[in-house]
């Protein structure tokens, strides 16, 4: 009986019966188990975060959506639509050769910088920050796009100028000059959180490319001095720092959001109050379904829920770094550095988001990749995951000496 079942499971439908197109479709979704054509673990982890994010955004946004729109599922429906668009973008990215992004990296970086400049000219303000551009019914956050485009450019630059980065100071300074331009445009919005993520990602990629150690000490000292200057020049940053250090001194003013987030973490205990049973999301905690969604996770699912999210994000980052390492071992420099860049970007942004929600870091206004509410963040994060899958797919196909799907290189 078991032999018959095995034969049925291994049965292949002949192309003559269903047509060549159907056979190609079957082959696409049924790769050989011994050598899958994509990183199944990476894909599964990304889908798990998207699904978990939908559940938590639905739970966290019900009171706010009901108060603002009269429909408690308003944000949940929008988030579901964003997820569908993100999946479509991810699948479309899988069909684009990685070398196409490499060839257009300079133009993409220029486009990203132009978008950051446009925000200052035609953008509109939300919650005290001018970060959004509106084109008809569509609004997008230029900073999210700039992060991805900068990673793509850095990967291209390092793949072409790796020796120059290692041996000459100018090879190290060139990308930092571009980073400085992007940072100035971001600080004018202001968006200090994206500056932190972009700077840390760029410096980490230069380190992995083999830049000299003394150069990093110089960058570190410069960044510390610049940070001190920014805190002194902008009063609101000083206020955020003081609030972060002693939020209980102004629990109903500047320290209100952090205090409510800490209360949520405290009420969650080990296993949480149960899904949907958060008290802090009932108009107490601002931005409960966006930047502070981890506070709701902590309250409803407890320490175990927070640990599960952190573990999933870390595994996704680990897969990205593994892809990068394997690409470099096969002399695929661009794909390797891009995978490294995306992995570092995700890890830093997740670290900052969780650190802010738990009171370990000052407020920055960054989303949790693939989890928090927000169409821009979701779509760009999904596109980045699609790039990782495509890079790994090409690496595997190169190992099998077969031309990659999705177009000629």
Curated annotation (Swiss-Prot):
InterPro entries reported for this sequence: Cell_cycle_FtsW-rel_CS, FtsW, FtsW/RodA
GO MF annotations in UniProt: lipid-linked peptidoglycan transporter activity; peptidoglycan glycosyltransferase activity
Reactions this protein catalyses: [GlcNAc-(1->4)-Mur2Ac(oyl-L-Ala-gamma-D-Glu-L-Lys-D-Ala-D-Ala)](n)-di-trans,octa-cis-undecaprenyl diphosphate + beta-D-GlcNAc-(1->4)-Mur2Ac(oyl-L-Ala-gamma-D-Glu-L-Lys-D-Ala-D-Ala)-di-trans,octa-cis-undecaprenyl diphosphate = [GlcNAc-(1->4)-Mur2Ac(oyl-L-Ala-gamma-D-Glu-L-Lys-D-Ala-D-Ala)](n+1)-di-trans,octa-cis-undecaprenyl diphosphate + di-trans,octa-cis-undecaprenyl diphosphate + H(+)
Stored PROSITE patterns: FTSW_RODA_SPOVE
Biological processes annotated in GO: cell wall organization; FtsZ-dependent cytokinesis; peptidoglycan biosynthetic process; regulation of cell shape
Pathway connected to this protein: Cell wall biogenesis; peptidoglycan biosynthesis
Domain of life: Bacteria
Enzyme Commission code: 2.4.99.28
Keyword Thylakoid part of the UniProt annotation: no
UniProt cross-references to Pfam families, sorted A to Z: FTSW_RODA_SPOVE (PF01098)
Function as written in the Swiss-Prot or TrEMBL entry: Peptidoglycan polymerase that is essential for cell division.
Family: Belongs to the SEDS family. FtsW subfamily.
PANTHER family xrefs: CELL CYCLE PROTEIN, PEPTIDOGLYCAN GLYCOSYLTRANSFERASE FTSW-RELATED
Name this polypeptide is given: Probable peptidoglycan glycosyltransferase FtsW
Phylogenetic lineage: Bacteria, Pseudomonadati, Pseudomonadota, Gammaproteobacteria, Alteromonadales
């Amino acid at each position: 009986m078991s032999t018959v079942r095995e034969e049925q499971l291994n049965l292949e439908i002949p192309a003559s019966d269903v047509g060549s197109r159907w056979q190609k479709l079957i082959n696409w979704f049924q790769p050989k188990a011994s050598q899958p054509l994509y990183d199944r673990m990476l894909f599964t982890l990304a889908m798990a975060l998207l699904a978990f994010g939908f559940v938590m955004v639905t739970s966290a946004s019900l009171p706010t959506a009901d108060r603002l729109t009269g429909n408690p599922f308003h944000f949940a429906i929008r988030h579901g639509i964003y997820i569908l668009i993100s999946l479509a973008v991810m699948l479309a990215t899988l069909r684009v050769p990685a070398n196409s992004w490499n060839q257009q990296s300079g133009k993409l970086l220029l486009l990203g910088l132009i978008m950051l400049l446009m925000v200052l000219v035609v953008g509109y303000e939300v919650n005290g920050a001018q970060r959004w551009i509106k084109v008809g019914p569509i609004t997008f956050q230029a900073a999210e796009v700039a992060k991805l485009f900068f990673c793509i450019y850095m990967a291209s630059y390092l793949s072409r100028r790796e020796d120059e980065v290692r041996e000459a100071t100018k090879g190290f300074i060139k990308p930092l000059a571009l980073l400085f331009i992007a940072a100035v445009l971001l600080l004018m919005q202001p968006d200090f959180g994206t500056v932190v993520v972009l700077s840390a990602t760029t410096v980490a990629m230069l380190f992995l490319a083999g830049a000299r150690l003394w150069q990093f000490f110089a960058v570190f000292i410069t960044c510390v001095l610049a940070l001190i200057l920014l805190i002194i020049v902008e009063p609101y940053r000083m206020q955020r720092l003081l609030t972060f250090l002693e939020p209980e001194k102004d629990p109903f003013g500047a320290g209100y959001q952090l205090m409510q987030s800490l209360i949520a973490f405290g009420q969650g205990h080990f296993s949480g109050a149960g899904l949907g049973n958060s008290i802090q999301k009932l108009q107490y905690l601002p931005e409960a379904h966006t930047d502070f969604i981890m506070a709701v996770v902590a309250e409803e699912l407890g320490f175990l829920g927070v640990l599960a999210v952190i573990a999933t994000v870390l595994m996704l980052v680990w897969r990205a770094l593994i892809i990068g390492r394997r690409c470099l071992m096969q002399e695929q420099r661009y794909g390797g550095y891009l995978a490294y860049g995306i992995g570092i970007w995700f890890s830093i942004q997740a670290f900052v988001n969780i650190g802010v929600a738990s009171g370990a870091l000052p407020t920055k206004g960054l989303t949790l990749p693939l989890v928090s509410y927000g169409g821009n963040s979701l779509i760009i994060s999904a596109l980045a995951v699609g790039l990782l899958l495509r890079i790994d797919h090409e690496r595997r196909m190169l190992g099998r000496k077969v031309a990659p799907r999705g177009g000629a290189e």
